[in-house]
Amino acid sequence: MREHCVTSESVTEGHPDKVCDQISDGILDACVAQDPASRVAVETLVSGNIAVIAGEITTTAQIDAERTARAVIKAIGYDDPALGFDSDSCFILTNLRTQSPDINLGVSRGDELGAGDQGVFYGYACDETANLMPIPIALAHTLSLRLTMMRRDGTLPWLRPDGKVQVTMRYGRDGRPCGLDSVVVSAQHDEAVDRDTLVRGLVEGVIYPELHDWLQPGTRVLINPTGRFVVGGPAGDTGVTGRKLMVDTYGGCAQHGGGAFSGKDATKVDRTAAYMARYAAKNVVAAGLAGRCQLALAYAIGQIDPEMISVETFGTETVDGDRICAAVREVFPWTVSGMIAALELRQPRFRKTAAYGHFGREDQGFQWEKTDRSGELLALCTR
């Protein structure tokens, strides 16, 4: 293998696309909190001081989508009219209908649920980090989350909600990360802060505390490369739900089937199958059966079982690959109902996933981040 670089990005919760993801998942949570069997597919668009919420909801829950959206916007930090987008004054248009009866015909299958759509879905894990995520996206999320923490706790009071981070990692001939090539931090800021204060604050308060083990003399550090980032969030860019797929998953280090997650209830295999694929792949790596694992699933709308389960270990497997695939098929449930139950997806906690990645978040208690099936996998593969 030749030496190469891998680049991944993360964004803060105030990024316009992430504002939309959080509004969509906030509405989903509001429905699921009252009616765990809610069918939800909600999309959000923000532009200027306007938010548009549209989609399909079938539920017994009584929710106020506009009120939920305003609460999410305020919690993110858009609570000041000076930002050009704020929770109190923004205009919100809603267009929510019930789920198509044709889709419901395929999903509601008596005791079992059929898949809410067709598609291929991927899960990935590798041994580069303690949480079994690729290190470029892991570091990028760490930096973007720290940007938000420094804003929220007042350490860097001139920070504003929007921000982006990009990390480029060098990999050696052995395929292992060997150095940090560059890091880019673009942080929205108050107009009054001078550049020296901004650069010093971001280097000392954000970059160095998280990357000191990786920083080298040759590492390039770029901070607000345009020189100014005052206008940000929806005031600066239009945001749409589901437009940060690589941020949500593995930073481009694994394949992606193209389906977004946020705003979709658990019958939507775009979300549930991707979570289950991560769960299985992570347990394969945690069991020591492979250093890298990518699991692919395919479903057809209305069908209970997957059309395909495929396991790729990229030559890093420690036992025969066919045995790993057979064990994965046996240990994990692959029906739609089985995945929902195993992953505890009838609970209102989807908004937690909507910023800083859906994977690698071990502090959030997500079932798909647990490695509780690794022992069973190992036993099946080595007996």
Swiss-Prot record:
GO terms for molecular function: ATP binding; magnesium ion binding; methionine adenosyltransferase activity. GO terms for cellular component: cytoplasm. Pathway: Amino-acid biosynthesis; S-adenosyl-L-methionine biosynthesis; S-adenosyl-L-methionine from L-methionine: step 1/1. It is an enzyme of class 2 (transferase). L-methionine binds at residues 56, 99, 237, 268. Pfam families: S-AdoMet_synt_C (PF02773), S-AdoMet_synt_M (PF02772), S-AdoMet_synt_N (PF00438). ATP binds at residues 15, 162-164, 228-229, 237, 243-244, 260, 264. Its EC number is 2.5.1.6. Belongs to the AdoMet synthase family. This is S-adenosylmethionine synthase 1. It comes from Rhodopseudomonas palustris (strain BisB18).
